[in-house]
């Protein structure tokens, strides 16, 4: 899980979602998981 100021899609499987006011990236590749912090 990467914590970044700006989250970006790394590949085409990455999806940007909002969960409880937190912007997250979920992907089939676990290395692409990100959270905005």
UniProtKB/Swiss-Prot annotation:
One GO CC term on file: cytoplasm
PROSITE patterns, A to Z: RIBOSOMAL_L36
UniProt record, GO biological process: translation
Transmembrane segments annotated in the record for this chain: none
A GO molecular function held by the record: structural constituent of ribosome
Pfam families, sorted: Ribosomal_L36 (PF00444)
InterPro entries the record matches: Ribosomal_bL36, Ribosomal_bL36_sp
Keywords, sorted A to Z: Ribonucleoprotein, Ribosomal protein
Record-stated family: Belongs to the bacterial ribosomal protein bL36 family.
HAMAP family: Ribosomal_bL36 (MF_00251)
Protein name per its UniProtKB record: Large ribosomal subunit protein bL36
